[in-house]
Amino acid sequence: MTSVSLGMPAAPPPVLAPRRKTRQIKVGSVGVGSDSPISLQSMTTTPTTDINATLQQIAELTASGCDIVRVACPSADDAEALPIIAKKSQIPVIADIHFQPKYVFAAIEAGCAAVRVNPGNIRKFDDQIKEIAQAAKDHGTSIRIGVNAGSLDPRLMEKYGKATPEALVESAVWEASLFEEHDFHDFKISVKHNDPVVMVRAYELLAERGAWPLHLGVTEAGPAFQGTIKSATAFGALLSKGIGDTIRVSLSAPPVEEIKVGNQILQSLNLRPRKLEIVSCPSCGRAQVDVYTLAEEVTAGLEGMEIPLRVAVMGCVVNGPGEAREADLGVASGNGKGQIFVKGEVIKTVPESQIVETLIEEAMRIAEEYEEMGGEDGQGGIKGSPVVSVS
């Protein structure tokens, strides 16, 4: 397409800030920090003592794209379950430890890839950091120093009055210094708060204090809709500045939903290869079809598709043809029928009742061609087509 000059300087393409340089640690086989891809985490909701249920949930998370999984370990019975879970999990397992340092040692001995400790409720056992650091070194286990506004050290609450960004960072830096005193550096840090504004500022301050890998999270983010908004807002603000090495979306929802949201956040920022994307309009008085239903049915029909496919579902003749032409596959609807576009070309016109069926059939055909070719760009992707559009 020939560009048209309007006498204005061309804006550079949008890019994120350079990735913050950090140390790299390993959580099992997954690198965190430095040039490693930003990894995606979740946490099981099953009782850890129910080994089969926990492994089943881990398998579901793995299939959804989870890189690292955390399991709770509040009791001796949970600690006894860790060796089997750590051995049979397809992805690295982190044991989540509070109050009881003895479970830190148990998790390390069990073969967990990492252990999360909370300075807010384990700090009174700081005299055991030397032994924890040595055990972790001996077993190749990394540590997450996980500061949380809801369990901040009482001494810092008294000093600051509440869980301020400065309080969260002070807690994290103090604990980090103890591990570093014993020449242990294989740790990452999180400073979580339920307020995205406070959380973002805390991570900004922490990023200025050292080259530690950072685990991003908005704690207690809430139900699926609210938690998604909070996490997307906070992660977008930080990741666009190059801050963040691994993320966990916290939702009051099944863990697989956390992975779906996290994947979309990373894909939207081009921090993970884009897969299926559906672009749809919000609908208006011009729409001549039920855009909402079309978008939902197309999304459901293509769920699980792994190729980078852009599908456009458009509801009127204003933006419809243009959006459909820009997609790999699309429909511009109106007057009880839909024009089906593939790579910008109209290939057929179908009745409204056949739009969803036709789009799904064409998407499957494109997917088969993609698999046969190994990706049009030779690297598993369709050139210039990461999205599905519904308008």
From Swiss-Prot:
UniProt feature coiled coil, ranges: none
EC number: 1.17.7.3
Pfam families: GcpE (PF04551)
Keywords: 4Fe-4S, Iron, Iron-sulfur, Isoprene biosynthesis, Metal-binding, Oxidoreductase
SUPFAM superfamilies to which the protein is assigned, alphabetical: Dihydropteroate synthetase-like, Nitrite and sulphite reductase 4Fe-4S domain-like
Highest taxon of source: Bacteria
Pathway: Isoprenoid biosynthesis; isopentenyl diphosphate biosynthesis via DXP pathway; isopentenyl diphosphate from 1-deoxy-D-xylulose 5-phosphate: step 5/6
Disulfide bonds: none
Top EC group: oxidoreductase
Keyword Iron-sulfur: yes
Signal keyword on record: no
Region (Disordered): 372-391
Record text on cofactor binding: Binds 1 [4Fe-4S] cluster.
MF terms in GO: 4 iron, 4 sulfur cluster binding; 4-hydroxy-3-methylbut-2-en-1-yl diphosphate synthase activity (ferredoxin); 4-hydroxy-3-methylbut-2-enyl-diphosphate synthase activity (flavodoxin); iron ion binding
Cofactor: [4Fe-4S] cluster
Reactions catalysed: (2E)-4-hydroxy-3-methylbut-2-enyl diphosphate + oxidized [flavodoxin] + H2O + 2 H(+) = 2-C-methyl-D-erythritol 2,4-cyclic diphosphate + reduced [flavodoxin]
GO biological process: isopentenyl diphosphate biosynthetic process, methylerythritol 4-phosphate pathway; terpenoid biosynthetic process
Cited function: Converts 2C-methyl-D-erythritol 2,4-cyclodiphosphate (ME-2,4cPP) into 1-hydroxy-2-methyl-2-(E)-butenyl 4-diphosphate.
UniProt cross-references to PANTHER family, sorted A to Z: 4-HYDROXY-3-METHYLBUT-2-EN-1-YL DIPHOSPHATE SYNTHASE, 4-HYDROXY-3-METHYLBUT-2-EN-1-YL DIPHOSPHATE SYNTHASE (FERREDOXIN), CHLOROPLASTIC
Family: Belongs to the IspG family.
Stored HAMAP family: IspG (MF_00159)
Protein name: 4-hydroxy-3-methylbut-2-en-1-yl diphosphate synthase (flavodoxin)
Taxonomic lineage: Bacteria, Bacillati, Actinomycetota, Actinomycetes, Micrococcales
Gene: ispG
